[in-house]
Amino acid sequence: MYQISLKATKSAAEPTSSTDASHDDRQVERDSYDTAMLRFISDMELSSMYAEKTSPYPILMPRSFLEDLKNFQDLLFVAVSNILDRWWEDREADFPRRMPLEPHEESVLKHYNERPLHWRPDMLLPAAGDPNTNLPFKICEINARSPFNSMIKSICMFQAAAASKTALPDGLELASTADSLVDSLVSLFNPDLPLHVIWHEGITDPIDAFSSFYKKRTGKIPRVIRATDLRLAPDSSSPTGRILCCVASAASADHSNGQAIVSETGEPLERIYQVGLQMSHRDYSELSSEVLQQLAVDGICDLRNIFLVSDKRMLGVIWQELDSLVHKHHVLTAEQAEILRQGIVHTILPGSEDMERLLRQTREGSVSKDSYLLKPARGHRGMGILLGKDLGQEEFEGLLEELADPLLPADRRYVVQPFIEQALFGLRLYDDSEPQQCQMTGTYHAIGGCFAGLGVWRADSERICSRFHGAFSIPAIVPR
């Protein structure tokens, strides 16, 4: 796996690396890519942020990598689905004790409505030398809060690569296509029903971009609302006796059973039939339990994915359950469980025996703090990660002592993972810059449990590789 220059490559059999390409070839390739990207952004009325910090020189990767990801995702979906189905009923497994949730989350998850879902697992590329695995990647977390931001970045970059005047050499093709990613994203929703996107804080660029794609595919324009606009209205035809609505202007007020919908204070309301969600965990905590319950029933997103799957502790639960999934529940074979074990970073849960063992071994000196990191259970964008090598010995041990308690407040709740030494790649990120030794973090998208496409690679010379910490994004290509 390495970065190549399409302009300098004359044959798929003899690709030319970006580090060996001439300045002139690289400049032509960069100009063609930038022109295609800016044209696409302009045509779709997207933010220029999607053109920032991108490298046009793609990563050439083996097709077998994609096949491994597809197979892995199939098994991951089987494992997670079985765990979610047993979450409340399996008293022996006692998942709520192993992974405690906030009270408002526990109450609403008992009223969920299973819907299509979006997952975006992140993967690391370990340095060569592990004889115990045949997989080239390790999944370090699953992101499932919102499909919009990262998927749209991938759509823009693969579209620019496809539309660039620098043609792909015969025998090579893009690892994903913009059209297939857009189709997958739009498939989360029913185009025959109105769509509302609930947004609370932060930039609206991802939602604006999604709205453009959705309009082009369906001819419909989603209505973007804030969480504070949500209301409930009585409706005898609903299983809960209520329907989810939002504040509307008098001209657009909706009707239910032939009657205008108004709130108790006389506000004209508009019924919500399906929603896309761009909200943080704090946003959900600020909703009333009744509104949250109705979101669970009416929402297009199964809230178990937000409160359970997207929590970093879920990987630890999966790891703990692998033997049970084989020998007790019979949903995986031993070989399939081993694929998941090899492909998931070992994640240690607060309050677990593994956490107690790690603390004991650290005190004994048999393991080093430098070999571990702590990751906020509800963190995102690479923020809040603590590397053991950056902590003092007493500080590290003190954190592990705290993590003996699974009921820690949310802002003190971490998982512990081994620090994975990642492979380094010689990459050109900036124009006219010397190649840098960088690590790469990958991602892929899954819709409805099925692999939907590879995302773009993130590359940086820093230890935490995140686009929000300054990492560059790079598309990928594979042999036909």
UniProtKB/Swiss-Prot annotation:
Keywords: ATP-binding, Ligase, Nucleotide-binding. Residues 21-30 have a biased composition (Basic and acidic residues). It comes from the Eukaryota. One of its GO terms (molecular function) is ATP binding. Residues 1-30 are annotated as: Disordered. The keyword ATP-binding applies. Pathway: Secondary metabolite biosynthesis. It catalyses: NK13650 D + L-aspartate + ATP = NK13650 C + AMP + diphosphate + H(+); NK13650 B + L-aspartate + ATP = NK13650 A + AMP + diphosphate + H(+). ATP-grasp enzyme; part of the ank cluster that mediates the biosynthesis of NK13650 C, a highly modified cyclo-arginine-tyrosine dipeptide. AnkG catalyzes the last step of the pathway via amidation NK13650 D with L-Asp to produce NK13650 C. AnkG also amidates NK13650 B into NK13650 A. Within the pathway, the cyclodipeptide synthase ankA acts as the scaffold-generating enzyme and is responsible for formation of the cyclo-Arg-Tyr diketopiperazine (cRY) from L-Arg and L-Tyr. This is ATP-grasp enzyme ankG. It comes from Aspergillus thermomutatus (Neosartorya pseudofischeri).
